[in-house]
């Protein structure tokens, strides 16, 4: 038997029906149109939470990527600065080597060897580090952003490492590299010429790997300077080679002018050496030769001793000539007694001619008088001082003139010439002006003289060689090199222009 459901209105009373209608009307009146049912609230709450979590995750990911991009940019800038500084320092080393070669006269630097292989970091773009974010989607997005960043901004280090064939990714302190460097160093030592001394003759040779790798061969430096070119993003080569950019004509001009003060091979100035006298055979035929024993009279100075003609010992304007034989100490020097401190030159070589007042000035004759001048009971010291005149003693005796006149080449007429008693202090002071060690205030150095010559309006009409020879005659030696007075430079310039 089937059950048939009955309607509620069939069994409810009329009063109950009125109450249910009122409740239905009240419920419809309180609810608003469009409001979702209550059973959907838990689902919407979960959706809002998921959206907030995704938003926070994206913000954290963007913040992390921005920090990584800033770090990459800083590292790229530091790498570019380091490479630029390396190229600049290498160019400076080449310039200093060339300058050193000019002064030393050779380009052999056997004890300055560096390794030809320098180990450094590999290509930074070959190894990308993916940021792990906890989800596969996040890791893929972060790696893609890093790849896009590297594609947009290529690193300059990659271009340098790709275009620099002089570098290799090898450890400079490896065993193979050390053996190669030792072999190269031995070959360089065999190629060193015997006449050229090393820069550091007493340098200690260490066998540690660090010191071995701090040695630089000239071939390795030249190879690095010529082969290493920094290539930027636009592939513009900037070769920092300043080898032939200095001293176009200043170097030969100054080298020729520096001959006035001597060079490395000839320390004595050339123009004074060429004007020096021929080899002189010095004998002992002086007026004082009778004081020497016959054994020493047979000795004559050989003509092959060239230091007698050296301008350093026998200058044109100097007062000191060393025309004595110092090679053989066993043979007595005929004029050695003149070097004795107890020997009075003024009394020995004074004027022997008697004066009118000699009888009064003779101390021996005064002893025979009735009233002796040396009587201890009387104070006659004033009489003695008044009788002896200062002219009786030759105070202006010049020992150098006496030695010059005593030599055979000075005695052409066979007679002894008395030494000159004129005062030579003024001449000596004038000649000493040419040997001033500190530079005078109004002088010009070689580079300043060359600047003044090249800035002259008639520079093309000047005879540079002739002007240089004239400047050498006016040159002075100082701690700064050759210097010439400004007035002399201007005078010689005007004279050369008139010619």
From Swiss-Prot:
Motif (Bipartite nuclear localization signal) on chain = 20-27, 44-51
What does the record note as the disruption phenotype of the gene behind this chain?
Causes hypersensitivity to cadmium, 4-nitroquinoline N-oxide, 1,10-phenanthroline, and hydrogen peroxide. Abolishes the peroxide-mediated induction of COR33, TSA1, and many other genes involved in oxidative stress response. Inhibits trehalose accumulation upon exposure to oxidative stress. Shows significantly reduced viability when exposed to whole blood or polymorphonuclear cells, as well as to the Chinese herbal medicine baicalein. Also leads to decreased virulence in a Caenorhabditis elegans model. Increases apoptosis upon apoptotic stimulation.
The coiled-coil regions, if any, are: 49-105
Question: Its GO CC terms?
Answer: cytoplasm; nucleus; RNA polymerase II transcription regulator complex
> Bias category Low complexity: which stretches?
155-164, 186-215, 417-427
Q: Identify the stretch(es) annotated as n-CRD.
A: 254-261
Q: What induces it?
A: Induced by oxidative stress and during contact with neutrophils. Expression is also up-regulated by the thioredoxin TRX1 and by treatment with Chinese herbal medicine baicalein.
InterPro entries from the UniProt entry: AP-1-like, bZIP, bZIP_sf, TF_PAP1, Yap1_redox_dom_sf
Keywords assigned: Coiled coil, Cytoplasm, Disulfide bond, DNA-binding, Nucleus, Oxidation, Phosphoprotein, Stress response, Transcription, Transcription regulation, Virulence
Major location (coarse): nucleus
**Tell me, which GO biological process terms does this entry list?**
apoptotic process; cellular response to cadmium ion; cellular response to oxidative stress; cellular response to reactive oxygen species; lipid oxidation; regulation of DNA-templated transcription; regulation of transcription by RNA polymerase II; symbiont-mediated evasion of host immune response
Ranges where the record places region Basic motif: 43-66
UniProt motif (Nuclear export signal) ranges? 462-469
- Where is this protein found? Nucleus; Cytoplasm
- Region: Leucine-zipper; residue ranges are 68-75
Positions with biased composition (Polar residues): 123-148
Q: Region c-CRD: which residues? A: 446-477
User: What the protein does?
Assistant: Transcription activator involved in multidrug resistance, oxidative stress response, and redox homeostasis. Preferentially binds to promoters with the core binding site 5'-TTA[CG]TAA-3'. Involved in the oxidative stress response in via multiple pathways, including the cellular antioxidant defense system, carbohydrate metabolism and energy metabolism, protein degradation, ATP-dependent RNA helicase, and resistance pathways.
- Subunit details: Interacts with YBP1.
Give the family from UniProt. Answer: Belongs to the bZIP family. YAP subfamily.
**What does the record say about domains?**
Contains two cysteine rich domains (CRD), referred to as the N- and C-terminal CRD's, n-CRD (Cys-254 and Cys-261) and c-CRD (Cys-446, Cys-468 and Cys-477), respectively. A nuclear export signal is embedded in the c-CRD, with which the nuclear export protein CRM1/exportin 1 interacts only in the absence of disulfide bonds (or otherwise oxidized cysteines) within the c-CRD or between the c-CRD and the n-CRD.
Name of the protein this chain belongs to? AP-1-like transcription factor CAP1
Organism for this UniProt entry: Candida albicans (strain SC5314 / ATCC MYA-2876) (Yeast)
Lineage, opening ranks: Eukaryota, Fungi, Dikarya, Ascomycota, Saccharomycotina
